């Protein structure tokens, strides 16, 4: 594993515990355990509960294992996609859990660690895979997909409404793209200078988000889990808490909760981080938390 000197600060920890309500003898499924920040807080808060943590990123799991070593008798970590959580629990002979947590988005390690390709701040290979065993990389997507398909991805997943086609055209013109700075260059050539100056965030943020979402099938996985898996994994009275970081994710969560006959929504509007937390951890600014409780058996 690469040398790592950056530490991930979990967002909205107090709110996660408030809505998840971990209790002794209960089992919590942390579907995106990452570096173990939320998991540690849950285990510290509830000395008698157990936690199953899963993540597709084998490197962050190594960090989580070290962070959670004091709770080794109450925590089990696995490399897996939360989309396949039902199969994992079946192999563990666990029928239901009492709480589910999803903290979506990219971890600090993925952003700050070397050669992962998630950042536009320095030159790295165009990777962007959360699961390093996956065959689809950002480089493959950017160099092999058609201009039309790239424009669709940037429009839909990056919410780049006005300039998606121009960006896709510049990507194709600049091929082959091999590094993150190659992609930044293509985006900068596509956007008018006044648009670059106008944007509050880095001008390539939306395009990087779009390619990352596509590479990792983030929205498909979230939709599949919420619509077809989550309710079946929860006991009646169990709770699901989801933290999202952009409107595409939040929309899926909101609609899944509202369209379910078996969930009672606990957060009519998304809960946002406190002003104090945003000051201490600017990354939390865009976080939205939604929670629901299973009130009717979710099936086998």
From Swiss-Prot:
One Gene Ontology term from the biological process aspect of the record: rRNA base methylation
Protein EC: 2.1.1.199
Binding residue positions for S-adenosyl-L-methionine: 36-38, 55, 89, 103, 110
Keyword Cytoplasm included in the entry's annotation: yes
Superkingdom: Bacteria
Cell compartment(s), UniProt: Cytoplasm
Family: Belongs to the methyltransferase superfamily. RsmH family.
Role this protein plays: Specifically methylates the N4 position of cytidine in position 1402 (C1402) of 16S rRNA.
Protein name: Ribosomal RNA small subunit methyltransferase H
Lineage: Bacteria, Thermotogati, Thermotogota, Thermotogae, Thermotogales
Name of encoding gene: rsmH
């Amino acid at each position: 594993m690469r040398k790592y000197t950056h530490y991930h600060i979990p967002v909205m920890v107090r709110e996660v515990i408030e809505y998840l309500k971990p209790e002794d003898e209960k089992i919590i499924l942390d579907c995106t355990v990452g570096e173990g920040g939320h998991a540690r807080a849950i285990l510290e808060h509830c000395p008698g509960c157990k936690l199953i943590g899963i993540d597709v990123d084998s490197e962050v799991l190594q960090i989580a294992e070290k962070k959670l070593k004091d709770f080794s008798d109450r925590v089990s970590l696995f490399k897996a996609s939360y989309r396949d959580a039902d199969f994992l629990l079946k192999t563990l002979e666990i029928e239901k859990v009492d709480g589910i947590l999803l903290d979506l988005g990219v971890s600090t390690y993925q952003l700050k660690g070397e050669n992962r390709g998630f950042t536009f701040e320095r030159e790295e290979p165009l990777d962007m895979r959360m699961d390093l065993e996956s065959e689809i990389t950002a480089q493959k997507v950017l160099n092999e997909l058609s201009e039309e398909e790239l424009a669709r991805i940037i429009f839909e997943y990056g919410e780049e409404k006005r300039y998606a086609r121009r960006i896709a055209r510049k990507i194709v013109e600049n091929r082959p793209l091999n590094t993150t700075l190659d992609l930044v260059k293509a985006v900068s050539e596509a956007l008018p200078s006044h648009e670059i100056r106008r944007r509050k965030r880095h001008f390539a943020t939306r395009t990087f988000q779009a390619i990352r979402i596509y590479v990792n099938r983030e929205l498909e996985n979230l939709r599949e889990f919420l619509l077809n898996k989550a309710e079946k994994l929860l006991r009646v009275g169990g709770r699901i808490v989801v933290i999202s970081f952009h409107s595409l994710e939040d929309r899926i969560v909101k609609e899944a909760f509202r369209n379910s006959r078996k969930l009672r929504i606990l957060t009519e509007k998304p809960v946002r981080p406190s002003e104090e937390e945003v000051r201490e951890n600017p990354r939390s600014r865009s976080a939205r938390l939604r929670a629901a409780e299973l009130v009717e058996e979710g099936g086998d």
